[in-house]
Amino acid sequence: MSFLWSTVSFLIVIAVLVTVHEYGHFWAARKCGVKVHRFSIGFGKVIWSRTDKQGTEFAVSAIPLGGYVKMLDGRNEEVPETLKSQAFDHKTVAQRAFIIAAGPLANFLFAIFAYFLVYSIGIPSIKPVIDEVRPQSIAAMAQIQPNTQITEIDGVSTPDWETINMLLATKLGESKVDLTLVEFGSNIEQHRTLDLSNWTFDPEKQSAFGSLGIVPVRSKVDMILSKITENSPAEKEGLRKGDKLYWSDNSKIEWYTFLEKVQEGKPLTLKVERDGVWFDKTLTPELNEKKRWFVGISPTFYPLANEYRTELKYDMLEALQKGVEKTFQLSWLTIKVIGKLITGNLSLNNLGGPISIAKGAGASSEIGLIYYLSFMALISVNLGIMNLFPLPVLDGGHLVFLVMEALKGKPVSEHVQNVSYRIGAVLLLMLMGLGLINDFLRL
């Protein structure tokens, strides 16, 4: 069910964002007087279509992993003299650049609109208050204290943990990062600098702030078992609802630390208290259908105090402003990450593919529509930035050729363009393949 849900959620994201992207090209082409033969969502065999009064075929094709706008173009077909004024290749450099750039621009505008809706409706969140700083961690070395709230990272406002995680993740490979904090409930600022020179973390296994030793305020958890999953390691070991768990040395178990230990996949030796009787148990994690280690227990959760809860909600004008700010912030962060991947400051192992997107889509849609919309906006920004990357097969590559044409006064030769397209296609396939390989390795 989870796989099916993730797949459907992923296909909806792709269908919506590809439609938005291609509509940008289509709208700009129409505005510039270019005849459009076909607007297709998907590739391959057409399974549904209709034609409008201007002769454009709107189609849905069999492979729902992309789309295209086919325009009248003398480079690909014979164009009658009477239609040359409507051909893409007969438009000015500025008009062609506008048509090409309109696709990524549409993705950015969609992200702004999506975040506008998110911030108008309101998205529940948790204030970035630190509950604990792990001993000997990078955060501890910087003398960061519990019960402080992170308000800025390198001068950028941090209203929630999601923003903090995103900002910190982009600092990987840098030497330091500056944090602004206030004692919770106070306005007195503290400034701390974290030394990142030896910092590494695996985004698949931990958060960026968690790897620095920062533990956020979360729902309080008691290791009194409230549920045992059927056919789980816990049930096989005879654990029951109401059992209280401790480490083998009788020390208290922190739930989130316990989860980290479970993900190591190694046997866990525990003390169990049941009706005043103590005994030992060893839980050996097993892999579930999501290929994650589990033992099949649920502790007792207590609601997080309201003082730590917040809702990111604004009036319409401010929500629009926040939507623009968020889109620009994500765009810049995406560019920084791409730059670090190219320079080697960030491992290519962090590159994700369609499976990562599908998992994110499925997870966000299960949480709620507002989170799904926020995820869609994030992917839309990434799609816009990636399409502006100067590879010849992408919009950015086409724009590079147009800049060269404007500087030289004549188009780049077809031979150079064809060779560039082949090289670009190979590089793009290699990147996509690497992303897919990384996805499979994470399963």
Q: What role is predicted for each listed range?
A:
Residues 67-135, 158, 185-186, 372, ...:
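Internal alpha-helical transmembrane segments
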Residues 86-87, 91-94, 207-236, 241-385, ...:
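Functional transmembrane alpha-helices
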Residues 32-37, 122-140, 145:
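Alpha-helical transmembrane signal-anchor/signal-peptide segments
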Residues 21-24, 60, 103, 387, ...:
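Divalent metal-coordination and catalytic microenvironments
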Residues 30-111, 190-196, 203-217, 314, ...:
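Membrane-embedded helix-turn/re-entrant segments that form the catalytic/gating core
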Residues 19, 23-28, 105, 109, ...:
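Active-site His/Glu-centered metal-binding helix of metallohydrolases
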Residues 97-131, 166-174, 178-226, 280-308:
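PDZ/PDZ-like peptide-tail recognition elements
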Residues 1-10:
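Feature marks short, highly hydrophobic, charge-poor N-terminal signal-anchor/signal peptide-like helices
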